[in-house]
UniProtKB/Swiss-Prot annotation:
Keyword check for Methyltransferase: no
Subcellular location: Cellular thylakoid membrane
Protein task: This b-type cytochrome is tightly associated with the reaction center of photosystem II (PSII). PSII is a light-driven water:plastoquinone oxidoreductase that uses light energy to abstract electrons from H(2)O, generating O(2) and a proton gradient subsequently used for ATP formation. It consists of a core antenna complex that captures photons, and an electron transfer chain that converts photonic excitation into a charge separation.
Complex and partners: Heterodimer of an alpha subunit and a beta subunit. PSII is composed of 1 copy each of membrane proteins PsbA, PsbB, PsbC, PsbD, PsbE, PsbF, PsbH, PsbI, PsbJ, PsbK, PsbL, PsbM, PsbT, PsbX, PsbY, PsbZ, Psb30/Ycf12, peripheral proteins PsbO, CyanoQ (PsbQ), PsbU, PsbV and a large number of cofactors. It forms dimeric complexes.
Keywords: Electron transport, Heme, Iron, Membrane, Metal-binding, Photosynthesis, Photosystem II, Thylakoid, Transmembrane, Transmembrane helix, Transport
Membrane-spanning ranges: 20-36
GO CC annotation terms, alphabetical: photosystem II reaction center; plasma membrane-derived thylakoid membrane
NCBIfam families listed in its UniProt record: cyt_b559_beta (TIGR01333)
Family: Belongs to the PsbE/PsbF family.
Organism encoding this protein: Nostoc punctiforme (strain ATCC 29133 / PCC 73102)
Superkingdom in the source lineage: Bacteria
This protein's name: Cytochrome b559 subunit beta
Binding site for heme: H24
Membrane topology: Single-pass membrane protein
Length: 45
């Protein structure tokens, strides 16, 4: 039980990383604005 402590804490990348935060803080508004602009193309006054 001395070196078996590392099994529950893998060295692989976790889900919530700084890269995940950066991708989603940039990507979610980008997709939202792209969808809004694309929807505005079909609105004719």
């Amino acid at each position: 039980m001395t070196s078996g402590n590392n099994i529950n804490q893998p060295v692989t990348y976790p889900i919530f990383t700084v890269r995940w935060l950066a991708v989603h803080t940039l990507g979610v508004p980008t997709v939202f604005f792209l969808g809004a602009i694309a929807a505005m193309q079909f609105i004719h006054r």
